[in-house]
Structure formats: C-alpha cells, structure tokens
C-alpha cells in the first residue's frame, strides 16, 4: 500500500498496521508472475551483475526480490537450497509468539540457563550477562532477533521442543522447503549438498512476507515481531548500507565461519511506502575455510533494490 507521506519511520510503519491490507492485496496480484520466476531475459542487466559477482567472489548467489506495489521482481537461483544460518531466528521467535504465548502471559515467564548453555552456543552477547537471573521469553526473543544471540535462540528452540519445531512451523505456514535440524552453532556448518538447515531465497522471502505482511500471526504479535526486526542491530553496517537512503527495513541476517555463508532476509519499505521483499543467500561450496562475505551482501542489497525499485 502506498502511503501519502514522503518517508516512513519505524513508528509510522507499526502505527499504520504495517500496511497489511494493501500490501497483502498487492502481493496476491503479483503472485502468479513472481511464482513463475523471472528469467534472465526479463532483467538481463541485473542478472549479468549477479553472475559477475558470483565470479568475482567465487560464490553461489541466490536472490529473490519483489516490489509488492509494482510487481517488479528479480530471481536468481531462487529455488535452490542454501544454508539458512541465523535467518531462522525470526521463525523461532514467531513460532514462540504463535504457539506458546496464546494468552500473552508466557512472554513474561523467566527462563533459567547455565554458563554451559552460554559457552556452547558460541555467541551470546546478551545472555552472557544474565546467567544469574535468567531472562524472560520476551527478552530472549529480542536478543535472538536484534543481537543474533545463539544462546537465546537455543533456549527458544528448547521451549518449542527442538529445532524440528521450526520446520513444522514453516509447513503450517505453507512453506514446504525451509527446514531446521540442528542447534546453534552446528547449524551454520554449511557443508555443500547438505539438505539439513536449509532454505531457498523464494521460500524464506515468502515466509517472512506471511509473518510481517500477512496474517500468520495475530496483529499484536505481528507488530512485536516486526518491531524487533526493524530494530535489528546486526545489519546496520552491512545489508542496510547497500540500500537507498530513506528506506525502512525489517530484516535478519545470518552467516557462518565456513564456506563463505552470508545471508539476508528483509521486508523493506521505500520512502513512499511500497513494500519490497529482499532476500539474498550466498555460499562458497569450494572454499571450506572462507568466512561470510559481508562486502558481497552489501553489493547485493544495491543490486536488488535497483532492480525492483529504481530511483
């Protein structure tokens, strides 16, 4: 839904109910074209840029971008599988909101954990400071999405019944592809040809769309999840820097220390309020010691935004 204002803020996005009715209607009108896929001939310049980046970075790149206001789209390896990494954390928090917090009381429940939980998670910027007191489920969700805290994510998975609960959650949303099998940090291993802990650019983009712009969650839970994504801290100097100024972004990143895995899944709004799906998944199957390629993700943000929402 296009809004009359010239720019959007986090408050206006949330206060307007995320543009749900218009965005979803626009999504339905463009769904047939997007699901059919964009062939290279439909956007040859953008596809050439993606292929050049694959050669330059020795990476396999999968993208799905869709402007829900205009129908402009860009797909490249959009239905191929890629390691998911921390992009799953949005799904875990959403599953907690829908399946555990039926009456609103569970978010205030305190979860206790140990120093061993923190240590084995490999990345615990928030949970490491609350071992003595524990953390509420609400704060664990916040830490999971906004700081990509692995320990917090594992604790949410434990409450849900394990990683496969995320797979079941995705299936309930109509996503037949996305799956989670392991815990943090093992799920980030990124071995080539492994189907576990994977998604495709198209599948994860559509699932994020259902959660943020659709009716997969009730309105209060949808607003809460979107607020966490809007205030995400892990992409402020990465994916978001490659987008045009004035865009409002709700997103989650992911990555690993092997096979060059670096991912991004986002819902963005242009300054005039057009909702845009942006997903970029990257993987370097031939480079087992390669860290995640942040410069590549920044470049992909620019390619995707210019392809589907040119200035």
Swiss-Prot record:
Kindly state which keywords UniProt assigns to this record, in alphabetical order: Antibiotic resistance, Hydrolase, NADP, Signal
Q: Residues that bind substrate, according to the entry?
A: 252-254
**What are the EC numbers?**
3.5.2.6
One GO molecular-function annotation for this sequence? Answer: beta-lactamase activity
Write down the SUPFAM superfamilies for this protein, in alphabetical order.
beta-lactamase/transpeptidase-like
Database matches in PROSITE patterns:
BETA_LACTAMASE_A (PS00146), TAT (PS51318)
Q: Name a single GO biological process.
A: beta-lactam antibiotic catabolic process
Decide whether keyword Iron is in the record: no
User: Signal peptide span per the entry?
Assistant: 1-36
**Processing and modification events after translation:** Predicted to be exported by the Tat system. The position of the signal peptide cleavage has not been experimentally proven.
Q: Which catalytic reaction applies to this protein? A: a beta-lactam + H2O = a substituted beta-amino acid
Q: What residues sit in the active site?
A: 86 (acyl-ester intermediate)
Q: Which NCBIfam families match?
A: bla_class_A
- Other notes: The class A beta-lactamase family has a specific amino-acid numbering system, sometimes called Ambler or ABL numbering and often misspelt as Amber. A multiple sequence alignment was used to derive a consensus sequence and then the consensus was numbered taking into account insertions and deletions. This allows use of identical numbers, e.g. for active site residues, despite differences in protein length. UniProt always uses natural numbering of residues, hence there appear to be differences in numbering between this entry and some papers.
Belongs to which family?
Belongs to the class-A beta-lactamase family.
The function of this protein is: Hydrolyzes benzylpenicillin and cloxacillin (at 10% of the rate of benzylpenicillin).
Q: What is this protein called?
A: Beta-lactamase
The root-end lineage is: Bacteria, Bacillati, Actinomycetota, Actinomycetes, Kitasatosporales
Gene designation per UniProt: bla
